[in-house]
């Protein structure tokens, strides 16, 4: 609210909003969008454009391709696990398809024939999109993986919970 007030005070009449999640979800991006529109009702002179998703941009794919290639993912004993934020199954919409499509495209760019999809940060209540990254790592180890590469493509900025999950919890599995 303070940011919008500052924008109005400075005399701006147009804003462009980009959510740091590359994938649109009703519970994530949609919640920010609803909150913003609610605040903007008090500022009728400000127009707003929201970029709801941007996962399908070439730069997004190229970034993840280069990051993944740096991890040498094609070794026989390596399991590659793509992950994104989990959402309640009742609000999935196109979110799961977008994430799966991005994971598949990046895997093809790198030459992965087999990879896993996982979901992180589900709330402890209700039904959320799964499987969890922990259960996928366990499955990859059962399948013979000696090395795990996590590709958190749903998280494009440092996210304390995901850093903890991937750097501490997942390492101890």
Regions found by a protein language model. Name each.
Residues 1-173:
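Extended amphipathic ligand-handling, pore-lining, and cofactor/metal-binding catalytic surfaces
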């Amino acid at each position: 609210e303070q940011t919008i007030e500052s924008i109005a005070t400075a005399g701006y009449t147009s804003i462009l909003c980009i959510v740091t999640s590359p994938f649109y979800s009703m519970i994530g991006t949609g919640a920010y969008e609803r909150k913003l529109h609610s605040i903007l009702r008090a500022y009728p002179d400000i127009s707003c454009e929201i970029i709801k998703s941007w996962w399908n941009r070439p730069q997004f794919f190229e970034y993840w391709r280069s990051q993944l290639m740096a991890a040498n993912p094609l070794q026989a004993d390596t399991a590659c696990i793509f992950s994104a934020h989990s959402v309640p199954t009742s609000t999935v919409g196109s979110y799961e398809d977008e994430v799966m499509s991005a994971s598949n495209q990046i895997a093809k760019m790198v030459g992965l024939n087999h990879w896993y999809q996982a979901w992180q940060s589900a709330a402890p209540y209700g039904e959320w999109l799964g499987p969890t990254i922990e259960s996928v790592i366990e499955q990859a180890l059962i399948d013979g993986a000696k090395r795990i590469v996590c590709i958190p493509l749903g998280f494009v900025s440092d996210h304390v919970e995901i850093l903890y999950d991937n750097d501490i919890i997942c390492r101890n599995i």
